[in-house]
Amino acid sequence: MPRPGKSSYSDQKPPYSYISLTAMAIQHSAEKMLPLSDIYKFIMERFPYYREHTQRWQNSLRHNLSFNDCFIKIPRRPDQPGKGSFWALHPDCGDMFENGSFLRRRKRFKVLRADHTHLHAGSTKSAPGAGPGGHLHPHHHHHPHHHHHHHAAAHHHHHHHPPQPPPPPPPPPPHMVHYFHQQPPTAPQPPPHLPSQPPQQPPQQSQPQQPSHPGKMQEAAAVAAAAAAAAAAAVGSVGRLSQFPPYGLGSAAAAAAAAAASTSGFKHPFAIENIIGRDYKGVLQAGGLPLASVMHHLGYPVPGQLGNVVSSVWPHVGVMDSVAAAAAAAAAAGVPVGPEYGAFGVPVKSLCHSASQSLPAMPVPIKPTPALPPVSALQPGLTVPAASQQPPAPSTVCSAAAASPVASLLEPTAPTSAESKGGSLHSVLVHS
C-alpha cells in the first residue's frame, strides 16, 4: 500500500543541499542576514520534510554554516534585541551557484587564507630583517632583571649598531600593489649599497656612492614610472574591483592576473562584450568586409558622410580607409567607380533592373503567364444581351458553352460568331 501523501511529494526531501537552503533564506531576507533560528523557520515553512527530525538536520545545517567559507558570522549590535549572531553570505561567493540555480553548485567557495598567512610570515620575517632586535627589544629590556647588567649592555650595543641603515619596507598586500606603484620608490634605493659598508660607518658616507650607478637608478626610475602608469590605468578601468585578488590565485599570481586584466580589458564572461562583441568585431577585422564595401556590392548607394559615422563608431576598424584606397586605385586605372557599378566597372543596375528601382541588384526569374485577349475584343460579346434586351435561347447558349468554354475567351472567332448570331436575331425581331 503506498504511503499517504506520496503523490503530492510534500513529504519528500527537497533536492537542495543545506548550503542552498541557507543561501535561499539569507537571500530572501530584507537585510540579507538572518540569525540561526530564522533560518530554521524559513526552511520549515517552505519544506514540510524538515518539520520532522528537526534536531538531526538542524545540527547538520549548523555544521555547514560553521565549516563553509561562503557564510560569515556577524555579531549582533547592542541595540538589536535577541541573542545569537547573524549569518550572511560572503561578498565574493556570488558565482557559487551555476547560472543562479540553487540546484547545482559550481565548486566549494574557499577564502584564500594562504595569502594572509604568507603576508603575516613576510611581516614577521621583515621585522627582524629591519633590525635584529625588532621583536627582541621588549625581551632585552627585561634582561637586566634576569641577567647581569654588562651582558644586557653588550646585547643592547650589539642590537643598536646594525639598525643604522634604513629598514627595507615590508612586501605590500596583493590588493594594494597598485597604490604602492603610484609612488616612485626613492627611499628603498639606498639599502642595496648599505650592506657593503662596515657597521660603524655613518649613513652619510653612502651618498657619494649613489652617482656611481646612474644607469641602475635610471632603470629603476623608468620601471617605477611604467608601474605607476599601469596602476593608474588599472584603477581607472577596473575601479575598486581591482583591489580584490581573483578567486583561486596566490599573491604573486593575483598581482599578475590583475595586471593582465588591466591591460586586456577583461570583462566579466557575461558581459555583453564577451557575448556579441567578439562576433561582429571578428567579422569586420578578420573577414575583410567593410561596411561600405558590402553596401556597394549589394547595390545600395554609399553616402559621403558614412565615413565619419563609421570612423566614430568603429575607430579601430579601418572601414572607410580601405574603401577610399580602392576607389583611388580604380579611378587611377580608369575604371568607373560608383554605386551603380560592380566589380571591374561593370554596370549592375542596367543589366538587372531599371534605374528607378531601389532594390538590391539581383536577377529575379519571372514565370511566363498565359496570354489573354484584349479587353476590346470581349466588349461586343458582352453587349449583345443589352442591345437585344432579350436573352438568347437556352439551347444556343448551352451549345456554345458546351462546345468550347476556353476557346470563347482565347480565340478571336468566338466573339465574331456571337456577334453574328446576335445580329441575325436583332434583324428577325425588327422585321417581325
Swiss-Prot record:
<dbReference type="InterPro" id="IPR036390">
    <property type="entry name" value="WH_DNA-bd_sf"/>
</dbReference>
<feature type="DNA-binding region" description="Fork-head">
    <location>
        <begin position="13"/>
        <end position="107"/>
    </location>
</feature>
<dbReference type="GO" id="GO:0006357">
    <property type="term" value="P:regulation of transcription by RNA polymerase II"/>
</dbReference>
<feature type="compositionally biased region" description="Basic residues">
    <location>
        <begin position="136"/>
        <end position="162"/>
    </location>
</feature>
<comment type="function">
    <text>Transcription factor.</text>
</comment>
<dbReference type="InterPro" id="IPR036388">
    <property type="entry name" value="WH-like_DNA-bd_sf"/>
</dbReference>
<dbReference type="GO" id="GO:0000978">
    <property type="term" value="F:RNA polymerase II cis-regulatory region sequence-specific DNA binding"/>
</dbReference>
<dbReference type="InterPro" id="IPR047389">
    <property type="entry name" value="FOXB1_B2_FH"/>
</dbReference>
<dbReference type="InterPro" id="IPR050211">
    <property type="entry name" value="FOX_domain-containing"/>
</dbReference>
<dbReference type="GO" id="GO:0005634">
    <property type="term" value="C:nucleus"/>
</dbReference>
<dbReference type="InterPro" id="IPR001766">
    <property type="entry name" value="Fork_head_dom"/>
</dbReference>
<keyword id="KW-0238">DNA-binding</keyword>
<keyword id="KW-0539">Nucleus</keyword>
<keyword id="KW-0805">Transcription regulation</keyword>
<dbReference type="GO" id="GO:0030154">
    <property type="term" value="P:cell differentiation"/>
</dbReference>
<feature type="region of interest" description="Disordered">
    <location>
        <begin position="118"/>
        <end position="220"/>
    </location>
</feature>
<dbReference type="Pfam" id="PF00250">
    <property type="entry name" value="Forkhead"/>
</dbReference>
<dbReference type="GO" id="GO:0000785">
    <property type="term" value="C:chromatin"/>
</dbReference>
<feature type="compositionally biased region" description="Pro residues">
    <location>
        <begin position="185"/>
        <end position="202"/>
    </location>
</feature>
<feature type="region of interest" description="Disordered">
    <location>
        <begin position="413"/>
        <end position="432"/>
    </location>
</feature>
<keyword id="KW-0804">Transcription</keyword>
<dbReference type="InterPro" id="IPR018122">
    <property type="entry name" value="TF_fork_head_CS_1"/>
</dbReference>
<dbReference type="GO" id="GO:0000981">
    <property type="term" value="F:DNA-binding transcription factor activity, RNA polymerase II-specific"/>
</dbReference>
<protein>
    <recommendedName>
        <fullName>Forkhead box protein B2</fullName>
    </recommendedName>
</protein>
<dbReference type="InterPro" id="IPR030456">
    <property type="entry name" value="TF_fork_head_CS_2"/>
</dbReference>
<feature type="compositionally biased region" description="Pro residues">
    <location>
        <begin position="163"/>
        <end position="175"/>
    </location>
</feature>
<dbReference type="GO" id="GO:0009653">
    <property type="term" value="P:anatomical structure morphogenesis"/>
</dbReference>
<feature type="compositionally biased region" description="Low complexity">
    <location>
        <begin position="203"/>
        <end position="220"/>
    </location>
</feature>
